[in-house]
Amino acid sequence: MPQNDYIEEHIRRHGRRLDHEERQRKRAAREVHKASAVAQKVTGLKAKMLNKKRRNEKIQMKKTLKAHEERDVKQASTSSDPNQALPTYLLDREGQKDAKALSSAVKERRKDKAARYSVPLPQVRGIAEDEAFKVIKTGKRKQKGWKRMVTKPTFVGESFTRKPPKLERFIRPMGLRYNKAHVTHPELKASFNLPIVGVKKNPQSPLYTQLGVLTKGTIIEVNVSELGMTTTTGKVVWGKYAQVTNNPENDGCVNAVLLLSS
């Protein structure tokens, strides 16, 4: 084996290739696919050794993530100097130990904002991908299967423009598109047929939210301007969140309950 550093010497003298960073980036991106292919093909003792190695890597990764999370948390410091005198107005306060310069007050405010709404359905059944999407065969020989047709009801906005058919991956049928929902006001005990403004959150996955899939437990935004709701300053409320409480694919309509801030 060579004992000298001729490679490093050449790099110092002549530099690297012009596309060195691009090649490194592509190589790093390929490593994931190579590791996946090896994990699927390997068997026997090599598979056991690989699984053990991956398990140790995941454990180490979880420990690192936990350490980062603990670094961000503000803790009360118990190691205060008892000999140090404190003013009277500071005696009832706990010493704060900042792990970061950023205050955790912003995070607490976000948590409080998220807890303002009590959701009628906190848990829903998971939907498999085979249940929500149907494979569409394309191509001259009908051998390509990269297109999917959404088999669940969806909401498509007025400003939506279809892609060219050769580039459209997800197809949302016109017969399964809904623009209005039967929204029940929990305090008034009355239902209103309100237009849907958008899909805020689908509990299944971000892809379902992006496609506007309406399943049980989905948080939608509805236009409540005709209800005459106002804010404390007297402004008319235009949009409110509501949660879908039924299975629209079975009932043929969207039923939802209005989410009111507590």
Curated annotation (Swiss-Prot):
Which parts of this chain are annotated as the region Disordered? 1-38, 53-85
Start-end of Basic and acidic residues biased regions: 18-34
What the entry lists under InterPro entries is as follows:
NSA2_fam, Ribosomal_Se8/biogenesis_NSA2
GO BP terms in the entry: maturation of 5.8S rRNA; maturation of 5.8S rRNA from tricistronic rRNA transcript (SSU-rRNA, 5.8S rRNA, LSU-rRNA); maturation of LSU-rRNA; maturation of LSU-rRNA from tricistronic rRNA transcript (SSU-rRNA, 5.8S rRNA, LSU-rRNA)
Keyword list, A-Z: Nucleus, Ribonucleoprotein, Ribosome biogenesis, rRNA processing
TM stretches of this protein: none
Where does this chain carry the motif Nuclear localization signal 1? 11-18
In what ranges is there compositional bias, type Basic residues?
53-65
- Keyword Ribonucleoprotein, does the record have it? yes
Q: Where in the cell is it found?
A: Nucleus, Nucleolus
**Role of this protein:** Involved in the biogenesis of the 60S ribosomal subunit. May play a part in the quality control of pre-60S particles.
Protein name stated in the entry = Ribosome biogenesis protein NSA2
